[in-house]
Curated annotation (Swiss-Prot):
It comes from the Eukaryota. Residues 371-455 are annotated as: Interaction with CTNNA2. There is a cross-link at K76, K177, K181, K226 (Glycyl lysine isopeptide (Lys-Gly) (interchain with G-Cter in SUMO2)). Keywords: DNA-binding, Isopeptide bond, Metal-binding, Nucleus, Phosphoprotein, Repeat, Repressor, Transcription, Transcription regulation, Ubl conjugation, Zinc, Zinc-finger. It comes from Bos taurus (Bovine). The keyword DNA-binding applies. One of its GO terms (cellular component) is nucleus. Residues 1-20 are annotated as: Disordered. This is Zinc finger protein 639. Interacts with CTNNA2.
C-alpha cells in the first residue's frame, strides 16, 4: 500500500491557485504536485524526521536533493539548498486576512536552531493571495505567516541579556520571523505583563515579603492584594497607612483601648513611650530638681548630685547666727544644732510633769544624707540650703511662742500663760512688766506703770487681766480666753 496516497484537489475561493494558468509547473511524482501534508486540516499529527535534517547539515551547499523528508511526529521541515519555504505537516498555511498586514513590533532575530518557522521576506508592491508551490518551484514571492501549534511558549521568554547578546552578534544569512505571540494567543493589551527575570531557582519572588511563585501572574496578584496601599486604608487618629482594610481595623482597636493619660494635662495616647516623651517635652519644669545655689534645673536627683560635685570645694556655707563657715552642709547643720539649739525650739502644748506650756529644746532641722536636703521637723519643709530652713522655722514656727520669761527662760504661746507664770514669781515679791524691763514688789505699782507707760502704744486694756493690745481686734480675739477659764 502506498504510504503517501494521492489526494484530491480541494476547491476553495481561490481556484486560480490550482489552475494551469498560474504558469508554475508541477511535479508529477508520488504527490502529483499536490502537498499531502493535510495543510488544510485542523489537527495534523505527522511530523518530519529530525535525523533527515541533521544529515542535510553535513552535505555541501552545491549538492541538491529532490527527496522529501519522511514525517514522524511534530516540527517543520525545510530545504537548506533553496531559499524558499518547504511545507511541513505542522505548519498551518493561513490566509492573508488572518493577521494584520502590518509588521509586528515583536519580530525577533534568532539563529538557525530556533523552532520558529523560517521564511525569506521579499517586499511586494501589492498584496496578493498566498500561493502554494512545490519543492522545485521558483522561490516564493508572497510572505507567508505561519506559526507552530505546539510552539513552546517558554522559548520566547528569553531574558534581556540573552537577547542583547544575540543582537550584538553578526546576524545569520537566513532570518526567521516570529509572529507576535499575543496575536496567536488572543492576549489583549490589558493582559500583557512586563517581562521579569526569575531567580536562580526559577521562582518570582516578592521584594516586600517571603512570597514566591513559579508564575508571574501569581506574584502580580499577590502585590495587588497584599502590598498595594490606598488612601482609604489610613488611620484617622495617627495617619498611619496599611496595605489592607483588615490591618486597619485591627489597628483601630488600639485607639479604642484605655489610653495613657497625662496627669498634668489632658494629653492621651495608647503608647506609653509617647506619654513619657510628652511629659519630658511639655512638663519638664514641673518635676525638676534644682540647685538653689546657681538656680540650675535637672530632671533627676542623680544629675543634681553630679552637678553639686561641679561646685568648687572652696564654696563656704555660712551660719546665720554666727560667723561660722564650712564647705560641708552637714557640718553646718551639726553646728547649728549644737551651738544655737536654744534658738530652734518648739512649744509643747501638752502637759509635761503637770506644767502646761513648758518649752522643750528640740531641734527643728534635720539633714537627709540620701537626698542632700535640710528638712524641717515640724512640717517637712526641705531645702538644700540651711539658711532657707532656718528662715522658714523663724517665720512659721516661732511666732506661736513669743513670750519668754526673763527670770527662768521659759516661753509661752499666749500672754495669759505668761502672766500666770509671772504670778508664780509674786510670792517672791517681784512683779515684772511684760512689755518692758520694769519690775516692782507691788502689784498696784505695776498697774500704774502699765497705764502711764504703755497706754499710748497699747490703748485697749483687758478688764480681766493686765493685758493691753494695740487694736480692738486683738482684744476681741483675746476675750475668749477668759470664757474658757
Amino acid at each position: 500500500m502506498n504510504e503517501y496516497p494521492k489526494k484530491r484537489k480541494r476547491k476553495t475561493l481561490h481556484p486560480s491557485r490550482y489552475s494551469d494558468s498560474s504558469g508554475i509547473s508541477r511535479i508529477a511524482d508520488g504527490f502529483n504536485g499536490i502537498f499531502s501534508d493535510h495543510c488544510y486540516s485542523v489537527c495534523s499529527m505527522r511530523q518530519p524526521d529530525l535525523k533527515y535534517f541533521d544529515n542535510k547539515d553535513d552535505d555541501s551547499d552545491t549538492e541538491t536533493s529532490n527527496e522529501l523528508p519522511k514525517f514522524t511526529d511534530g516540527i517543520k521541515a525545510r530545504n537548506r539548498n533553496q531559499n524558499y519555504l518547504v511545507p511541513s505537516p505542522v505548519l498551518r498555511i493561513l490566509d492573508h486576512t488572518a493577521f494584520p498586514t502590518e509588521k509586528s513590533a515583536d519580530i525577533e532575530i534568532c539563529d538557525e536552531d530556533c523552532d520558529s518557522p523560517e521564511s525569506v521576506h521579499q517586499q511586494t508592491q501589492e498584496e496578493s493571495p498566498i500561493e502554494v508551490h512545490t519543492a522545485e518551484d521558483v522561490p516564493i514571492a508572497a510572505e507567508v505567516h505561519a506559526i507552530s501549534e505546539d510552539y513552546d511558549i517558554e522559548t520566547e521568554n528569553n531574558s534581556s541579556e540573552s537577547l542583547q547578546d544575540q543582537t550584538d552578534e553578526e546576524p545569520p544569512a537566513k532570518l526567521c520571523k516570529i509572529v507576535d505571540k499575543s496575536q496567536a494567543l488572543n492576549v489583549t493589551a490589558q493582559q500583557k505583563w512586563p517581562l521579569l527575570r526569575a531567580n536562580s531557582s526559577g521562582l518570582y519572588k516578592c521584594e516586600l515579603c517571603e512570597f514566591n511563585s513559579k508564575y508571574f501572574s501569581d506574584l502580580k496578584q499577590h502585590m495587588i492584594l497584599k502590598h498595594k496601599r490606598t488612601d482609604s486604608n489610613v488611620c484617622r487618629v495617627c495617619k498611619e497607612s496599611f496595605s489592607t482594610n483588615m490591618l486597619l481595623i485591627e489597628h483601630a482597636k488600639l485607639h479604642e483601648e484605655d489610653p495613657y493619660i497625662c496627669k498634668y494635662c489632658d494629653y492621651k495616647t495608647v503608647i506609653f513611650e509617647n506619654l513619657s516623651q510628652h511629659i519630658a517635652d511639655t512638663h519638664f519644669s514641673d518635676h525638676l530638681y534644682w540647685c538653689e545655689q546657681c538656680d540650675v534645673q535637672f530632671s533627676s536627683s542623680s544629675e543634681l548630685y553630679l552637678h553639686f560635685q561641679e561646685h568648687s570645694c572652696d564654696e563656704q556655707y555660712l551660719c546665720q547666727f554666727c560667723e561660722h563657715e564650712t564647705n560641708d552642709p552637714e557640718d553646718l547643720h551639726s553646728h547649728v544644732v549644737n551651738e544655737h539649739a536654744c534658738k530652734l525650739i518648739e512649744l509643747s502644748d501638752k502637759y509635761n510633769n503637770g506644767e502646761h506650756g513648758q518649752y522643750s529644746l528640740l531641734s527643728k532641722i534635720t539633714f537627709d544624707k540620701c537626698k542632700n536636703f535640710f528638712v524641717c521637723q515640724v512640717c517637712g519643709f526641705r531645702s538644700r540650703l540651711h539658711t532657707n530652713v532656718n528662715r522658714h522655722v523663724a517665720i512659721e514656727h516661732t511666732k506661736i511662742f513669743p513670750h519668754v520669761c526673763d527670770d527662768c527662760g521659759k516661753g509661752f504661746s499666749s500672754m495669759l500663760e505668761y502672766c500666770k507664770h509671772l504670778n508664780s514669781h509674786l510670792s517672791e515679791g517681784i512683779y515684772l512688766c511684760q512689755y518692758c524691763e520694769y519690775s516692782t514688789g507691788q502689784i498696784e505699782d505695776l498697774k500704774i506703770h502699765l497705764d502711764f507707760k504703755h497706754s499710748a502704744d497699747l490703748p485697749h486694756k483687758c478688764s480681766d487681766c493686765l493685758m493691753r493690745f494695740g487694736n480692738e481686734r486683738e482684744l476681741i480675739s483675746h476675750l475668749p480666753v477668759h470664757e474658757t477659764t
